Amino acid sequence: MNVFSQTQRYKALFWLSLFHLLVITSSNYLVQLPVSILGFHTTWGAFSFPFIFLATDLTVRIFGAPLARRIIFAVMIPALLISYVISSLFYMGSWQGFGALAHFNLFVARIATASFMAYALGQILDVHVFNRLRQSRRWWLAPTASTLFGNVSDTLAFFFIAFWRSPDAFMAEHWMEIALVDYCFKVLISIVFFLPMYGVLLNMLLKRLADKSEINALQAS
C-alpha cells in the first residue's frame, strides 16, 4: 500500500464516493428493467453494478481497507435517498413527472431499502475478503474471491428485500430465478471483463502514482 497525504485521501474519498453513488443510482433504475438473455430472466442492473466491486477492490489495493470502509459508510444514506428519488421519477423506465415524489411508492422504497442493505453487506464482505487476500502473489486471487463472495450476499439480500411478495407480479414470481441469473451474469461479466480491467487499471494507477511521488521528491529536494 502506498503512502498518501491527507489531501490525497480526501480527494480519493470524494471522487470514489461520487462514483459509487453514480453506479448505485443507475443500477437501482436499471434493476427495474427486466431483460431476457438466452431464455433467462435478469435485469439491466447486472451489467452496471460490477463497477462498484471494481472500484472497491482498487481502493483497497491502493489506499487500504480503512478508506474503502469510509467510502461505504459515506455513501449509504445519500444512495438510499437519491435512489428513491430517481427510481420514483423514472418508475418502470418511464418519466413520471415531479408529482410522483408527492406520493409514497412502496415498490421503489423497497428497491431503495434493499439497495441500502445489499450495498452495505456486499461491500463490507468484499473489503474483508479482498483485504485478507491482497498480499497473495496471484494478483487475480483477491479480486476474484471478493467478487464471488461479495456478489452472493449483495444479490441475495437485494432481491429478497426488494421483490419477495412484491406488488410487481412478474418480479414477485421470478425473483429467485432472476437473482440466480443476475448473480451468474455479474460473476461472468466481472471475470471476463472487469478482472482484466482491474489488472490494467491497477498497473496504470500504480505507475502514475509512482511517477507523481518521484516528481514530488525531486521538487522537495
Swiss-Prot record:
Residues 1-12, 56-70, 119-143, 206-221 are cytoplasmic. Residues 34, 92-97, 165-184 are periplasmic. GO terms for molecular function: transmembrane transporter activity. The chain crosses the membrane at residues 13-33, 35-55, 71-91, 98-118, 144-164, 185-205. Pfam families: Vut_1 (PF02592). InterPro entries: YhhQ. Signal peptide: none annotated. It is found in: Cell inner membrane. GO terms for cellular component: plasma membrane. Keywords: Cell inner membrane, Cell membrane, Membrane, Transmembrane, Transmembrane helix, Transport. Involved in the import of queuosine (Q) precursors, required for Q precursor salvage. Transports 7-cyano-7-deazaguanine (preQ(0)) and 7-aminomethyl-7-deazaguanine (preQ(1)), with a preference for preQ(0). PANTHER family: QUEUOSINE PRECURSOR TRANSPORTER (PTHR34300:SF1), QUEUOSINE PRECURSOR TRANSPORTER-RELATED (PTHR34300). Belongs to the vitamin uptake transporter (VUT/ECF) (TC 2.A.88) family. Q precursor transporter subfamily. This is Queuosine precursor transporter.
